[in-house]
Design a protein with these regions (language model features):
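Long, positively charged, glycine-interspersed low-complexity recognition regions
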Residues: 120-140
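PAPS-dependent sulfotransferase catalytic domain
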Residues: 1-118, 122-125
Length: 140
């Protein structure tokens, strides 16, 4: 895939902060998977949880979805910047107006420090590869 991607003149990636991604993914999947009732258990059994395709689609790492090297992309956007940065770029590129994104709304989700630490551990590959807001600007 790396070779095919390199052949493209414009290569766009949209990533999500790893902690936000896994926590949001858990709560989204929880709506459709009645057995998911504990974030702690989910984080402790993360590799086994990914065997469920529905959960894998929503909770896998940015690295798994986008590859290990953000610098292969010509344009990298944080999901939070879709409307303010990516949309204007695509409108300029295509010459047409594009509808803004409509993200699902939910109440504030609070997690414990231990859960955040475990989520960071589970998503460590994204921090190593730079798929996080702390490192992305230095990788591209």
């Amino acid at each position: 895939y790396h070779k095919e991607l390199k052949e493209c003149e414009i290569r766009i990636a949209v990533y999500r902060d790893p902690i936000d991604k896994i926590i949001s993914g858990f709560y989204y999947c929880q709506e459709f998977k009645p057995g998911l009732n504990s974030l702690d258990h989910f984080l402790d059994t993360y590799p086994q949880q990914l065997k469920d395709n529905y959960i894998r689609i929503h909770c896998r790492t940015n690295t798994d979805m986008l590859g290990p090297d953000p610098s292969i992309y010509t344009h990298v956007y944080n999901m939070r910047d879709i409307d303010t940065k990516l949309l204007p770029f695509l409108e300029q590129l295509g010459g047409k107006k594009i509808q803004k994104t409509r993200l699902r709304e939910h109440g504030t989700r609070t997690i414990t420090e231990a859960q955040e630490a475990k989520a960071r551990e589970v998503m460590a590959i994204d921090y190593k590869n730079g798929w996080c807001k702390e490192l992305i600007s230095s990788k591209i």
